[in-house]
């Protein structure tokens, strides 16, 4: 078995040199992701597609996850590759694979062919289709809108029988576009906007303005690491945390109430622009949508943009909130966003929807900009790959357990979707499911006379959640790592 990875069609409208470069980058990205956790799997550039071979049942799911979550891929064909003697041999192999699939249904046959053969693609389609129609009495040929399309490819002396077709993310390979800096809060909007730029081929670095203490920062680190791990782990990117509480305190003390929201956003953009310039990044990404809150009117957005020369990208500018939430659900960030605290919206009681330049400048004249310079100077810059390591170092008091006694409860903190895909069943041990986003509010409702071992797939989320629980006074918490 092998995977035939088809780049997104937009790649093929590029010039020959650009197309080759894009596919080469996609090949490198896939190899980096796939060979990190597998052995013996080969990733080969076949010019117009990428072949992933050397698979067995052990690595099939890991590779499938990689090709369906890597930007720049339109679709992937999961194929069984065999040799063939002639058209009749091809027909017999197709019949063996598709007999049960087409029983009682309408079907057609579609062939792609490369190389020199004594038959054309249409001749082969007619031969195989006619044979299937005769061999399976309950099946009927229907060339338009059939129930089943029997697909296969003939590549020189090899026959690729298509087992399944898996949709890809689309977009451009990661790293083909310039880097961007996402101003991420952990909510629905910033997570989706970050994903859209990953999908479009930009390496996304994350910048977080902390207004809510350690718990908020841990939450945003979790969603940033999740996005990177799931969609962009072939890239080395940074996570920048800025303690913005001194800036907020200065605004609350000195700035007129109605101007606070816009001025806070202007401070965000100033800070982001300063960091972007240091990192050589040309654009900042925000999750702002037109009219969603008072600071996001056209007038206010214009005043916000004017404080920096760095390009500000707003991929969600015309999106409805419902559509944003739907995408967050699809990409896996909805559960993070549901419980992520949002602080910016409550900074002003009577926010202006049409700020005036002179008023803003008058209020900002009261602001001590050395505070902004200091928080940027003190910003913590880290490789996003270090978040997993940091979670271990920050929580050395969290005991790691690999063997279980019968008197403990394993707390599966994965999302419902992850639990459904691979349920955690441990013979003789009680397993409860409490998603990570409900830990803070519902852990206290559990029987505190018992010991709880938190479990997630990679151990990052479980360690971070254990740290939060211990900081809140719970002593009956450990991490389960089988």
From Swiss-Prot:
Keywords: ATP-binding, Cytoplasm, Disulfide bond, Nucleotide-binding, Redox-active center, RNA-binding, Thiamine biosynthesis, Transferase, tRNA-binding. The keyword NADP does not apply. Transmembrane segments: none annotated. ATP binds at residues 183-184, 265, 287, 296. Residues 404-482 form the Rhodanese domain. Signal peptide: none annotated. The gene is thiI. Belongs to the ThiI family. This is tRNA sulfurtransferase. It catalyses: [ThiI sulfur-carrier protein]-S-sulfanyl-L-cysteine + a uridine in tRNA + 2 reduced [2Fe-2S]-[ferredoxin] + ATP + H(+) = [ThiI sulfur-carrier protein]-L-cysteine + a 4-thiouridine in tRNA + 2 oxidized [2Fe-2S]-[ferredoxin] + AMP + diphosphate; [ThiS sulfur-carrier protein]-C-terminal Gly-Gly-AMP + S-sulfanyl-L-cysteinyl-[cysteine desulfurase] + AH2 = [ThiS sulfur-carrier protein]-C-terminal-Gly-aminoethanethioate + L-cysteinyl-[cysteine desulfurase] + A + AMP + 2 H(+). Residues 61-165 form the THUMP domain. Catalyzes the ATP-dependent transfer of a sulfur to tRNA to produce 4-thiouridine in position 8 of tRNAs, which functions as a near-UV photosensor. Also catalyzes the transfer of sulfur to the sulfur carrier protein ThiS, forming ThiS-thiocarboxylate. This is a step in the synthesis of thiazole, in the thiamine biosynthesis pathway. The sulfur is donated as persulfide by IscS. GO terms for cellular component: cytosol. The keyword Transmembrane helix does not apply. GO terms for biological process: thiamine biosynthetic process; thiamine diphosphate biosynthetic process; thiazole biosynthetic process; tRNA 4-thiouridine biosynthesis.
């Amino acid at each position: 078995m092998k995977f035939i990875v088809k780049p997104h069609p937009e790649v093929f409208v590029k010039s020959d040199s650009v197309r080759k470069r894009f596919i080469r980058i996609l090949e490198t990205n896939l190899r980096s992701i796939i060979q990190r956790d597998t052995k013996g799997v080969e990733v080969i550039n076949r010019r117009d597609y990428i072949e992933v071979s050397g698979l067995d049942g052990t690595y099939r799911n890991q590779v499938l996850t990689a090709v369906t979550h890597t930007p720049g891929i339109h679709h992937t064909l999961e194929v069984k590759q065999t040799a063939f003697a002639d058209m009749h041999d091809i027909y017999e192999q197709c019949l063996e694979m598709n007999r049960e699939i087409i029983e009682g249904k309408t079907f057609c046959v579609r062939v792609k062919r490369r190389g020199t053969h004594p038959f054309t693609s249409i001749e082969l389609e007619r031969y195989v289709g006619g044979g299937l129609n005769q061999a399976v009495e309950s099946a009927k040929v229907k060339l338009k809108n059939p129930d089943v399309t029997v697909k296969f490819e003939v590549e020189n002396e090899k026959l690729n029988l298509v087992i399944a077709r898996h949709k890809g993310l689309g977009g451009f390979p990661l790293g083909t576009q310039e880097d961007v800096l996402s101003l991420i809060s952990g909510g629905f909007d910033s997570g989706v906007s970050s994903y859209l730029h990953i999908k479009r081929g930009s390496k996304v670095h994350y910048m977080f303005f902390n207004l809510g203490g350690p718990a908020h920062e841990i939450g945003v680190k979790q969603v940033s690491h999740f996005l990177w791990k799931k969609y962009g782990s072939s890239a080395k990117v940074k996570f920048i945390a800025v303690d913005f509480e001194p800036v907020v305190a200065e605004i609350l003390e000195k700035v007129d109430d109605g101007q606070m929201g816009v001025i806070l956003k202007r401070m965000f953009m100033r800070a982001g622009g300063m960091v972007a310039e240091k990192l050589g990044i040309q654009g900042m990404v925000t999750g702002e949508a037109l009219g969603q809150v008072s600071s996001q009117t056209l007038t206010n957005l214009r005043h916000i943009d004017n404080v920096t020369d760095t390009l500000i990208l707003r991929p969600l500018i015309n999106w409805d909130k419902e559509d944003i939430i739907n995408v967050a659900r699809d990409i896996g960030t909805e559960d993070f966003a549901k419980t992520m605290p949002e602080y910016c919206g409550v900074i002003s009681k009577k926010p202006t929807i049409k700020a005036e330049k002179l008023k803003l400048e008058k209020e900002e004249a009261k602001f001590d900009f050395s505070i902004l310079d200091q928080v940027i100077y003190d910003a913590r810059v880290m490789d996003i790959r270090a978040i997993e390591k940091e979670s271990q170092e920050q929580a050395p008091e969290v005991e790691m357990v690999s063997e279980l006694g019968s008197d403990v409860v394993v707390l599966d903190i994965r999302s419902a979707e992850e639990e459904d895909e691979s349920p955690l069943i441990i013979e003789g041990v009680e397993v409860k499911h409490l998603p990570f986003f409900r830990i803070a509010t519902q852990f206290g409702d559990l029987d505190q006379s018992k010991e709880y071992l938190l479990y997630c797939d990679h151990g990052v989320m479980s360690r971070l959640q254990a740290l939060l629980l211990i900081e809140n006074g719970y002593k009956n918490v450990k991490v389960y790592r089988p």
